[in-house]
Amino acid sequence: FEGAIFVPRYLVSAFEATVDRENDVLASVVNKTARYRGGNNNADWDGTYKSLLGVPASSLSLTAFRDKARKLGADWGCYDWNVHTDIFWLYAIEYATLNSQKAFNPDLDAAGFRQGGLGAGVSDFNNWNAYNETYPFIPCGHTLSLGNKTGVVAFTLNAEQAVAYGSEHTEYVPSYRGIENPFGHIWKWTDGFLARGTMEYQEVYISRDRKQYSSTLNDSYIDMGHDAAANGYVKSILATTQSLSQTLRVYGDLIPTDDTGSATTYYTDYHYTAHEEGTIYGALLGGSAND
């Protein structure tokens, strides 16, 4: 229909990615062997409460994540800005809210529609730095029991972990239609988004051609305008800006233009920005375990 765009079929990994250390490629697996050790691949922590076996990889650049994915084939990639945007709007339509962190409610409302949200996610692990220096700690596949259903699964620290953390603690790990931790736990690099600092704001560029994704600007990256100049809670996004052409707005890109919202109004999410002159920035999405 008029104004619509076709979104081609793609696959999204069920879990946050780790690295196959033997072949140096990304892998979305439930596996606690050294071959798939997550975090920064620190073997010294094996057998301790801080073990990185079975958790996603971290401490890698966007370029490194992309390169490790592309070793699997030209059509493979790391987490994707355009995919994330699609997932967000599918959620927003299904749950009729922009706040994905509303309390989870498995029941439909009286009219047969979804209600609530996906819960707070893994976002209140307040002693994270002291616990394990902010490395991942939620095992890949923790929500596997849900299959492709949306829900949350409790993750409770064992006795040794609780001593290290300083108290007993439980996090509730969300899965949206089979995609584990769509937000929270660890910040996620998202490919296809680049921005150039101007000292005042970021000039934002988006690529729709996954085979052209890069860490430097190329001809596939489209100038989308600029983001909000300061940190703050998102009130409006570029996709709702009437001055932007409909051909660009139709993708629904979640680029903040007004950061005067709050934690309970509008988009309810926080936007961090930096804009040093000439610096090229990527996008980290989803928040982290202590935020």
Label the predicted regions.
Residues 1-182:
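Short aromatic-cysteine micro-motif
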Residues 83-85, 107-140, 144-149, 157-159, ...:
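C-terminal, surface-exposed recognition/capping segments
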